[in-house]
Amino acid sequence: MRFSKLSLAIATTLVTANALAQSVELDSINVIATRDPSRFAYTPEKQSKDSLLSKQATSVAAALEDIPNVDIRGGSRSIAQKPNIRGLSDNRVVQVIDGVRQNFDLAHRGSYFLPMSLIQEIEVIKGPSSSLWGSGALGGVVAMRTPNALDLLKNNDKFGVKIRQGYQTANNLSERDVSVFAANDKFDVLISGFYNNADNLRTGKGNKLNNTAYKQFGGLAKFGWQINDANRVELSHRETRFKQTAPSNNEVENELTNEQITDQIREFHKPNNGSPPKAKPSQEEFYSGVKTRFGSVSYLTDQQIPDQSTVFNYYLTPDNPYLNTHIALYNNKTIEKEQRKVSGVKDQTKLTTRGINLRNSSELSHISFVYGVDYMRDKIRTERGTNNKDAQFRADPYNANSNTTGVYLIAHIPLFGEKLLLSPSVRYDHYDTSSKTVKYKDNHLSPATKLTWIVTNWLDFTAKYNEAFRAPSMQERFVSGSHFGTSILGRNEINKFVANPNLRPETAKNKEITANLHFDSLFKQGDKFKIEATYFRNDVKDFINLKIFNDAKTNTNASASAGAGAGANPNGALLPTKSQYQNITNARLSGIELQAQYQTERLTLFTNYGSTKGKDKDSGEALSNIAASKIGVGVNYALVKDKFTVGATVTHYAAQRRVPKDHSVTYPSYILTDLRATYAPLKGEWKNLRLDFALENLFDRKYQPAFSLMEGTGRNAKISAVYSF
């Protein structure tokens, strides 16, 4: 068959050196996350399909956990897990699938809906990246690519089928997926379908996490037309549906209702009736805790999440150094539906994103340029049910639109015979958000620069300066109505949202330096040794947080009001009366990352270390949601070359005692041991079969990751069988 340079480039990026390599491929190249097809492009950290099959992870965050300073946030439910990169997560990390942004974000719920079976590879950029992707990239970028027929066809075959069955013991997870694919000189097509079904999750020492069962199913269709050597078009459509019964806050273990909190208040004010007095916290301490618990109210709900995306790509790659063009048109739609189990109250959040990306690169004699324009329009529609019982005090539904236009430029300037490489970049974004009554608009300039010094053929240094920003989300702009409330002691206690017209975007300024040593044939012919060390410091200004407080007209002395009971001063308040999104924190995130790998024809040894410290620059107080430092060591060995490989990894998570003053919990250290094996012959009668086995948390440790609200997964045996023909 005859494929264009573009098609061949896509196919060759899949080649990996080791069937079970857990370490990052530091010298592989791809253009999804970096948006840069030039030969000087920055290399992101990458997880190949081979590595993903070996790990059998159930979420993107779990698949990336062995990368220094990339951790899991969101608890043990796979749907709620999100990557935490250098202390930042959620809507401070940009998610990209097939070159298209995924903007759905609802607090304490999932936003990574692509199943692992539909992921061909994952790339990670750590650190601010708004010069590439605009708003939101304070912590970094996670970019995923789904497969096409050219990825799966072997040996110039024109037709193929791939069948996979996976099983995991921790939650009786069954994963089934089937792909059918074909290609000729002009056309290629892929159709994939999957079905995943899991029971409640088992944690360490045999405990069960209630309400963690789920089902997920869906599919992917891709069509490609190679018009000629210079022109190619692709059309893809992806659709998934996720179902579970869980607390509306997917990050907590069990539901917490208004009624439960009200019972606690009544118990606190219950008279002794002649009994010996019990030790109680002060009323100030008690109601401070009540405020926190009301902010975490979460009812058990039936949840459904339909998610779909349609993308049209056009590639123009003539034999012209000035033209290497990519145009993408896309439409994403995500709907999050919830219905409370007891009362039947329904909620719905629907986000539709339409956009276009245009990118071109030009190679001049002494300079390389990448430049482009992005436009996207987000439309959000929400519904919030109410009743006179468990849903009396709810946030109001809101409908809003957002338009964002970004223009960016990346340059690579080699100097002194390419011993130095200067790579400045800049992006300008203009955005506006509007509802029926309010409209906001703003703009932001995001510069970045990188200087690489190739000292010798085995040593190079890189220094970076990157800026990023995150515009306030539509929820932060437009949420209104009641945050929480209750009827207690003969009165309604209601906390209401207050709009903030002066809300500013979050901004980040990151400095980092990296040293990279790499040797070939160091100890024996053909071996490779790599070691990389990075130090970074990211100063984030105007963090947006939800502030809960009393207004100036309200008596903040809850003691007097509580003591008065039903006859309390009507201007008093047991609970804070206002909630508002405010810019309240200037933070500094700093840390180090170390990676080392030694590889021979059959043996791979690797180790990595990551540590992030976060503090409020004004008060010096520790920040929340900073993962514990971790160090991992591992080995892979091909017992039978090109056929059977075994491996092991041991990871030590340090204790996390750096927590905010009002966070009463610290987290002890723990060690996890994982084993794995892969049977994947490259030739012979079983060359179409691949078997992966993994045993995670070998010693069934009971542990709780830092700032997680639930325990981690216990011993988990995983097996996966793939057969292709």
Curated annotation (Swiss-Prot):
GO cellular component terms listed in the entry, alphabetical order: cell outer membrane
PROSITE patterns named among the record's database cross-references: TONB_DEPENDENT_REC_2, TONB_DEPENDENT_REC_3
GO molecular function: heme transmembrane transporter activity; siderophore uptake transmembrane transporter activity
InterPro entries registered for this protein in UniProt: Plug_dom, Plug_dom_sf, TonB-dep_rcpt-like, TonB-dep_rcpt_b-brl, TonB_haem/Hb_rcpt, TonB_Hb/transfer/lactofer_rcpt, TonB_rcpt_b-brl_sf, TonB_rcpt_CS
The TBDR beta-barrel domain, residue ranges: 158-725
Ranges spanned by the short sequence motif TonB C-terminal box, renumbered to the chain: 708-725
Topology of the protein relative to the lipid bilayer: Multi-pass membrane protein
Major location category of this protein: membrane
Keywords, alphabetical: Cell outer membrane, Membrane, Signal, TonB box, Transmembrane, Transmembrane beta strand, Transport
Domain TBDR plug intervals: 36-147
Pfam families documented for this protein: Plug, TonB_dep_Rec_b-barrel
Location in the cell: Cell outer membrane
Range of residues in the leader sequence: 1-21
Family note: Belongs to the TonB-dependent receptor family.
Job of this protein: Required for utilization of free heme at low concentrations.
The protein's name: Heme/hemopexin utilization protein C
Native source species: Haemophilus influenzae
Taxonomic placement: Bacteria, Pseudomonadati, Pseudomonadota, Gammaproteobacteria, Pasteurellales
